[in-house]
């Protein structure tokens, strides 16, 4: 018996040592990536690890977790690697920007990959292609030209479209989960958020997440094991073939780039200016460059394609995040989740009930939608932005249509009415 106990103790210590080494490696990787992403001088703004930052860190969980788990389950890619790389990029973004600058799954690619159950190398090829294209646009100055050409009402319209899509996702997919019980849980979570929206002592998001964990514990299937253990990341089995690169260019990269230009670059720059007017303005060149480097790093390591996003900033901000500490906290959570994630990834998702994720997502959607209010002094352009938002949300390739068509129409309207579009 003593010999067996010693063997068990040795196995536990070995597992803990491997976990600690993997965590240290992930943080070293994140620090190196942050140095690479910091294409401007270091920010003087400090990181604040407060309760509000901890709460705001999970403000984008309702968007990220379903897409991340959905991609892993549909494509069969290694869950540990996907979570660890995704978390390390969150940490790197927080260190580089010193803002709650989110790292999110590429939404158009995620939807196509989940629907088509694409192979991981095809998804990696798509991430590499958008990374190369965005890097060329950023470093050539093309992004600055696009930013000067696309007027503010079109950018606001893209945000309205994103807000509508996020709200519909929350209301039609996540909140109705578990039927009437799910709606009740979502209603309780929403009441908590409204009641604590101005509280700095008790952050609403942390209370809502705790509520979700309690609900998950009460409804956990009898006899079902917890998806916990220790696993280490692995590198992809193979590199994409030339044929997969060609497929990915048409199937994945083309639909994604229009959405990325509108939401990940232009709208993100605008939201940072809206929510952090006291901070130095971000350039589209910097945002595009970090977008590119993240994908060029993630794909070879077995991570999912990623981007920045205006909705993610709004979600983190709505729940209290004001510095890059929120990204470091969130990234640490994701890295640890990846290292401790075993078995079916969908089981891990059960720890965060759909109605809870839906409530967080709905708050994020409302925050994004309310950004259009700054056009209320020009009713014509407000109506134009709302029309652009409806087109972005409901038309096929809506973001590309609005980005191109909205810019052309707004230019024609300005010439005809001699009005200046607010910038």
Where are these regions (language model features)?
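Membrane-embedded helical hairpins/re-entrant loop segments and their flanking transmembrane helices
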Residues: 37-54, 70-92, 254-324
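Short, amphipathic, aromatic/basic-enriched membrane-interface segments that mark the entry/exit
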Residues: 50-57, 73-77, 94-100, 173-181, ...
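Transmembrane helix-boundary motif of multi-pass solute transporters/channels
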Residues: 55-117
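Transmembrane helix boundary and interhelical junction motifs in multipass membrane proteins
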Residues: 62-68, 102-109, 265-267, 303-312, ...
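Membrane-embedded alpha-helical modules
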Residues: 116-224, 329-423
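Helix-loop-helix junctions that connect adjacent transmembrane segments
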Residues: 202, 206, 213-260, 267
């Amino acid at each position: 018996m003593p010999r067996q106990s010693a063997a068990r103790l040795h196995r536990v210590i070995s597992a803990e040592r491997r976990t600690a080494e993997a965590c240290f490696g992930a943080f070293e990787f994140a620090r190196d990536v942050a140095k690479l992403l910091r294409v401007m001088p270091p920010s003087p703004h400090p990181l604040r690890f407060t309760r509000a930052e901890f709460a705001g860190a999970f403000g984008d969980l309702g968007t990220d977790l379903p897409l991340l788990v959905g991609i892993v389950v549909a494509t069969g890619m290694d869950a540990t690697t996907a979570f660890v790389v995704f978390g390390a990029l969150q940490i790197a973004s927080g260190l580089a920007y010193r803002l709650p600058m989110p790292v999110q799954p590429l939404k158009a690619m995620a939807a196509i990959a989940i629907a088509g159950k694409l192979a991981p190398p095809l998804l990696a090829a798509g991430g590499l292609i958008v990374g190369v294209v965005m890097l060329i646009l950023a470093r050539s100055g093309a992004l600055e030209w696009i930013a000067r050409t696309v007027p503010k009402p079109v950018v606001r319209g893209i945000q309205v479209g994103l807000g509508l899509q996020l709200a519909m996702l929350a209301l039609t997919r996540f909140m109705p989960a578990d039927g009437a019980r799910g709606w009740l849980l979502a209603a309780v979570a929403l009441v908590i958020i409204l009641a604590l929206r101005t509280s700095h002592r008790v952050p609403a998001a942390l209370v809502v997440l705790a509520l979700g964990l309690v609900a998950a514990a009460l409804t956990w299937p009898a006899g079902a094991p917890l998806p916990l253990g220790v696993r280490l990341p692995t590198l992809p089995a193979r590199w994409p073939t030339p044929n997969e690169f060609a497929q990915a260019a048409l199937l994945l990269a083309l639909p994604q780039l229009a959405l990325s230009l509108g939401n990940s670059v232009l709208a993100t720059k605008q939201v940072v200016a809206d929510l952090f007017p006291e901070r130095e303005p971000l350039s589209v060149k910097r945002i595009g460059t970090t977008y590119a480097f993240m994908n060029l790093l993630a794909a070879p390591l077995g991570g999912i394609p990623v981007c920045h996003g205006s909705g993610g900033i709004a979600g983190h901000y709505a729940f209290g995040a004001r510095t890059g500490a929120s990204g470091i906290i969130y990234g640490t959570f994701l890295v640890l989740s990846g290292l401790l994630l075993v078995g079916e990834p969908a089981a891990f998702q059960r720890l965060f009930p759909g109605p809870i994720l839906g409530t967080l997502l709905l708050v994020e959607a409302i925050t994004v939608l309310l950004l259009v209010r700054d056009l209320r002094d020009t009713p014509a352009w407000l109506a134009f932005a709302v029309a652009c938002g409806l087109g972005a949300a409901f038309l096929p390739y809506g973001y590309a249509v609005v980005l191109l068509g909205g810019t052309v129409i707004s230019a024609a309207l300005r010439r005809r009415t001699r009005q200046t579009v607010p910038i």
